[in-house]
């Protein structure tokens, strides 16, 4: 048993514990103090960082403010220079050239487009007489003549008109430059129904009066006032767009000479038996109380039962449904159920039709039915044309006076015609006492109720249908039987068809010929009378003679004449009267002619027809009719028919139809959508607020304004930037691709404004490099090639290609082809390549032969480029052309009369083109690498070209200076190699060439290694997929060309994988 250990005194233990606790406490306090110090240090650092960040932010904001202030100051200074420049040029005396001795530092449309139109106009350059006087290369017996599709005087021109005029002016300017004697005749159209409607809306909106309050004479006076205002506005717009029309020959379709032509045409065609008065079914607008043409009917598609409002009515009505009701067969309890979309017309039913082969109704042949609401006995007829026995009940109601199909059926069976409506669309006395005086769609509801009372209404169901609306009033079109004047079209249409089939008249695009044949071979007589006040009053007089019963529906009781006296004399001769006293009454028809009648005479009436004027002899027939494809039948066909009938000649040799302009969403332009664009707003620019304010200037109602405002805000949130006339014209022509509608995006027009700036700067560059003393030599195409260098030969080859493509495009009416060729020449070849390459040449001594040769080449290409561009951009090209020095032989005072560039076959050089293309591919490859790694152009990098053979080594070594400049390289080494280089990124141009950039110090290599690994995975995947295709058993059956192509692709992928691996290895070694 061990001895017990001596115990430590309690006091000592307590002291030790206390000491240890104190040490722990101190340690904790020290640790806490240290943490607190660290925290304070961290907070101090954070505070310092925040302070630094704040200071940096403040510094950046200050720098931004200073930069903005500097830019604003610079912009204001530039704007001041531009304002002063414009003020100076606006002082140019009318008709004199603008001073272009100093060009602004950048392109400004307003400055460029000032003065030149007055210069052209006042010097008579638009007239063929002046052209023949001063154009040295004019060919006087070769003419090019077009007439403008006359815009309606209903309002301002829109972008559709701008497209038409841009195309026409481009074509006219091209032919004028080619030395053909050019005449482009301007004019406006009175647009009967359209103009009457807008003026009626205007006087109601302003004074709450109708045309009937003013009377015919007073209202016509108001319309002439409107024509004066808007005719002048249209003329101003055409001038602003640069249209080179001969204003000395301007016409209006209701001026004295055109009115004489209309009267003469009507009288001749009446006397020839081509115009007759008869009662037929027409499109009737109850709101306007007139017949309207097919083109003035808009159709909407209804998929199912739809409630709709109708002008002049309260509430909404049922459309898109079939109403079913029953007729009772006379003398029996049998019912025949019929279905109709227009149940109100049953009040004027005069028959029920069944199919002759329908055995269900054989027993009813020759029987009658009793009208359920008026008790009238109506026949049950058999008709295999109208009735489809398998549709519905196989029974059809017949309303001859209010349905086209029923009308034709009634003519076949000799049925009674009962007119149900007044001109205003009210039910007349034929509808019965219960319904007379009702509005037609109120009658729809009332008829349903009346049938329900008799238990004869069987219900209604959804029915897909097309509903015709008046384009002017939006009222539902009512087919109505009305006495009207008609032109017999069969023979004229047959001649028009033959003209196209025989190739005497060409239609471009050719696809429209199908429409031409379909319309004209199925043509019906043309209703030419309108129940309006504004228009050419019909020169026909109803004659009531002693002893003869009056019948205004009988054509034989009508005579024609240019005035009352002539009509009286014609009546005496026609009816073999002893004197005018035998005429009890001779009253002129109050109706006016369809606008298309006078428009149909336009190509020859503008030349002075019916007189045989000098213009008729010199300029008719015209060369081309250019217009929208939507009026091929309504205008073009009628001009052809009337031209052949009245002059014995086709009015033009060729028709070119452009597509329709729509908004960027592909929607038809409509004021109520707010997407109708005024060309002036594109030319000058306009703010959003101003765009919205313009909506209130028209005749839109409050709901339409609200809808249009929403559309404007959506499409133009910041308004429309100033683009200028030239950019707008070029954009519109560039959009034209035959047969396709144009979905116009204003941003594309802005892009072409920037293109104008490129051309401006290119010409300013030429001025600086040519020098004030430069005088170009007489033009000698072959001499330019002598002792020149590759870049000069290349740009001449590019010019030759642009000329060739432009000529082809104009001949084919492929304006997109022309604009693309010109755009590519100026931007891709002149600006992006040639001008950059000439900088080193222009740094040589002044007497250097290659420098002088380059000056001549540069001048030649600028001159050619401006002439090619002139038909599309007349203002910019005139300004820059006038700023250039002249060759000794160039004495023409304006670019518009200069010769269009001629093809120079000696400049065509396929070898130099291919060589430069390969160089450009290399440049694109290098630039692509730089863009991928976000390396700015200002950062010059050592660059390598690895090639596979001696031929490529020599080719690219020879062009290395050219490549180096455009690839932003500090040095360019060309060698035969397939090795990677330290610190280099690689791009494979093709199987023969790779580009390498030394990016050490410019790129984060760790980031790039990760990117390259991802790239390699995709390359390997593509490689394995392609290889697996070649291992299938049936691969030998694959066509040889495809197998060869696969072999090349596999080889290229393998090579790119190897290069990528080497690059990853190189980057890894750098360990950066």
Swiss-Prot record:
SUPFAM superfamilies: Anticodon-binding domain of a subclass of class I aminoacyl-tRNA synthetases, Nucleotidylyl transferase, ValRS/IleRS/LeuRS editing domain. It holds the Pfam family Anticodon_1. It comes from the Eukaryota. Residues 16-79 have a biased composition (Basic and acidic residues). ATP binds at residue 671. InterPro entries: aa-tRNA-synth_I_CS (IPR001412), aa-tRNA-synth_Ia (IPR002300), Anticodon_Ia_Val (IPR033705), M/V/L/I-tRNA-synth_anticd-bd (IPR013155), Rossmann-like_a/b/a_fold (IPR014729), tRNAsynth_Ia_anticodon-bd (IPR009080), Val/Leu/Ile-tRNA-synth_edit (IPR009008), Valyl-tRNA_ligase (IPR002303). One of its GO terms (molecular function) is ATP binding. Residues 10-90, 1003-1069 form a coiled coil. It catalyses: tRNA(Val) + L-valine + ATP = L-valyl-tRNA(Val) + AMP + diphosphate. GO terms for biological process: valyl-tRNA aminoacylation. One of its GO terms (cellular component) is extracellular matrix. Keywords: Aminoacyl-tRNA synthetase, ATP-binding, Coiled coil, Cytoplasm, Ligase, Nucleotide-binding, Protein biosynthesis. It is found in: Cytoplasm. A motif ('HIGH' region) lies at residues 151-161. Residues 1-79 are annotated as: Disordered. PANTHER family: VALINE--TRNA LIGASE (PTHR11946:SF109), VALYL-TRNA SYNTHETASES (PTHR11946). NCBIfam families: PRK05729.1, valS. Belongs to the class-I aminoacyl-tRNA synthetase family. This is Probable valine--tRNA ligase, cytoplasmic. It comes from Dictyostelium discoideum. The gene is valS1.
């Amino acid at each position: 048993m061990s001895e017990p250990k001596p115990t430590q005194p309690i006091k000592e233990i307590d002291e030790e514990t206390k000491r240890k606790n104190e040490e722990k406490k101190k340690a904790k306090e020290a640790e806490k103090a240290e943490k607190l110090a660290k925290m304070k240090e961290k907070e101090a650092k954070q505070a310092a960082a925040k302070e630094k960040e704040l200071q940096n932010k403040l510094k950046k904001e200050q720098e931004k403010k200073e930069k903005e202030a500097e830019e604003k100051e610079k912009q204001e200074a530039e704007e001041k220079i531009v304002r002063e420049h414009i003020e100076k040029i606006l002082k140019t005396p009318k008709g004199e050239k603008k001073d272009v001795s100093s060009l602004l530092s950048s392109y400004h449309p307003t400055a460029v487009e000032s003065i030149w139109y007055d210069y052209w106009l006042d010097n008579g350059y638009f007239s063929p007489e002046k052209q023949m006087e001063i154009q040295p290369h004019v060919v006087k017996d070769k003419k090019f003549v077009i007439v403008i599709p006359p815009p309606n005087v209903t309002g301002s021109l829109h972008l559709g008109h701008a497209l038409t005029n841009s195309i026409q002016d481009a074509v006219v300017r091209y032919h004028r430059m080619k030395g053909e004697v050019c005449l482009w005749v301007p004019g406006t159209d009175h647009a009967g129904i359209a103009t009457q409607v807008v003026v009626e809306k205007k006087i109601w909106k302003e004074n709450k009066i109708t045309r009937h309050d003013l009377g015919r004479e007073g209202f016509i006076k108001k319309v002439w006032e409107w024509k004066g205002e808007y005719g002048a506005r249209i003329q101003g717009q055409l001038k602003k767009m640069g249209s080179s029309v001969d204003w000395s020959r301007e016409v209006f379709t209701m001026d004295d000479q055109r009115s004489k032509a209309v009267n003469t045409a009507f009288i001749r065609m009446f006397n020839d038996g081509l115009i007759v008065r008869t009662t037929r079914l027409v499109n009737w607008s109850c709101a306007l109380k007139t017949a309207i043409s097919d083109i003035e009917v808009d159709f909407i598609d209804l998929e199912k039962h739809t409630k709709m409002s109708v002008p002049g009515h309260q509430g909404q009505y049922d459309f898109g449904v079939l109403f079913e009701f029953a007729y009772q067969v006379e003398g029996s309890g049998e019912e025949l159920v019929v279905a109709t979309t227009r149940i109100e017309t049953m009040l004027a039913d005069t028959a029920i039709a069944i199919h002759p082969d329908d055995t269900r109704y054989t027993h009813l042949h020759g029987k009658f039915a009793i009208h359920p609401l008026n008790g009238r006995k109506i026949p049950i007829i058999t008709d295999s044309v109208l009735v489809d026995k398998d549709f519905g009940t196989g029974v059809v109601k017949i309303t001859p006076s209010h349905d086209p199909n029923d009308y034709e059926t009634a003519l076949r069976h000799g049925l009674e015609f009962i007119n149900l409506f007044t001109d205003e669309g009210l039910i007349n006395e034929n509808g019965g006492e219960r319904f007379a005086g009702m509005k037609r769609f109120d009658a729809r509801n009332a008829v349903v109720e009346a049938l329900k009372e008799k238990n004869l209404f069987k219900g209604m169901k959804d029915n897909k249908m097309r509903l015709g609306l008046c384009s002017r009033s939006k009222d539902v079109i009512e087919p109505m039987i009305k006495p009207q004047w008609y032109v017999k079209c069969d023979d004229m249409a047959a001649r028009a068809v033959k003209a196209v089939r025989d190739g005497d008249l060409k239609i471009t695009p050719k696809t429209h010929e199908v429409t031409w044949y379909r319309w004209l071979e199925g043509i019906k007589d043309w209703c030419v009378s309108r129940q309006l006040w504004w228009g050419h009053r019909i020169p026909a007089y109803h004659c009531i003679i002693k002893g003869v019963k009056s019948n205004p529906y009988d054509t034989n009781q009508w005579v024609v004449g240019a005035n009352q006296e002539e009509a009286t004399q014609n009546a005496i001769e026609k009816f073999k009267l002893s004197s005018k006293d035998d005429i009890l009454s001779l009253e002129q028809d109050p109706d006016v002619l369809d606008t298309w009648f006078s428009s149909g005479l336009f190509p020859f009436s503008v030349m002075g027809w019916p007189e045989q004027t000098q213009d008729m002899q010199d300029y008719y027939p015209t060369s081309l009719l250019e217009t929208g494809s939507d009026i091929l039948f309504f205008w073009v066909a009628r001009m052809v028919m009337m031209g052949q009938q009245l002059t014995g000649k086709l009015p033009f040799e060729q028709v070119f139809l452009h597509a329709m302009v729509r908004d960027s969403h592909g929607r038809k332009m409509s004021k109520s959508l707010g997407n109708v664009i005024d060309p002036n707003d594109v030319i000058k620019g306009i703010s959003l607020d101003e765009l919205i304010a313009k909506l209130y200037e028209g005749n839109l109602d409050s709901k339409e304004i609200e809808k249009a405002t929403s559309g404007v805000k959506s499409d133009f949130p910041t308004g429309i930037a100033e683009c200028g006339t030239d950019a707008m014209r070029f954009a519109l022509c560039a959009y034209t691709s035959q047969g396709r509608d144009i979905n116009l995006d204003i941003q594309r027009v802005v892009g072409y404004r920037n293109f104008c700036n490129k051309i401006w700067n290119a010409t300013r560059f030429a001025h600086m490099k040519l020098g004030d003393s430069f005088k170009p030599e007489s033009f000698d195409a072959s001499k330019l090639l002598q002792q020149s260098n590759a870049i000069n030969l290349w740009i001449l080859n590019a010019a030759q290609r642009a000329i060739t493509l432009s000529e082809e495009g104009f001949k084919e009416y492929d304006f997109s082809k022309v604009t693309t060729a010109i755009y590519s020449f100026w931007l891709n070849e002149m600006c992006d390549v040639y001008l950059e390459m000439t900088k080193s040449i222009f740094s040589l001594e002044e007497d250097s032969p290659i420098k002088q040769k380059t000056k001549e080449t540069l001048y030649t290409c600028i001159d050619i480029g401006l002439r090619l561009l002139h038909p599309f951009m007349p203002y910019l090209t005139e300004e820059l052309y006038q700023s250039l020095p002249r060759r000794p032989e160039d004495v023409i005072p304006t670019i518009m009369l200069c010769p269009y560039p001629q093809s120079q076959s000696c400049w065509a050089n396929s070898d130099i083109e291919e060589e430069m293309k390969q160089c450009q591919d290399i440049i694109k490859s290098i630039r692509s690498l730089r863009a991928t790694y976000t390396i700015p152009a200002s950062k010059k990098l050592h660059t390598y070209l690895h090639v596979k053979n001696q031929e490529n080594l020599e080719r690219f070594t020879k062009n290395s200076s050219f490549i180096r400049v455009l690839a932003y390289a500090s040095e360019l080494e060309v060698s035969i190699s397939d090795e990677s280089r330290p610190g280099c990124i690689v791009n494979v141009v093709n199987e023969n060439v790779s580009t390498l950039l030394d990016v050490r110090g410019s790129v984060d290599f760790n980031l790039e290694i990760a990117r390259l690994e991802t790239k390699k995975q995709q390359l390997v995947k593509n490689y394995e997929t392609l290889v697996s295709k070649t291992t299938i058993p049936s691969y030998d059956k694959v066509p040889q060309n495809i197998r060869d192509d696969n072999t090349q692709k596999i080889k290229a992928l393998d090579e790119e994988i190897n290069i990528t691996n080497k690059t990853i290895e190189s980057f890894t070694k750098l360990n950066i």
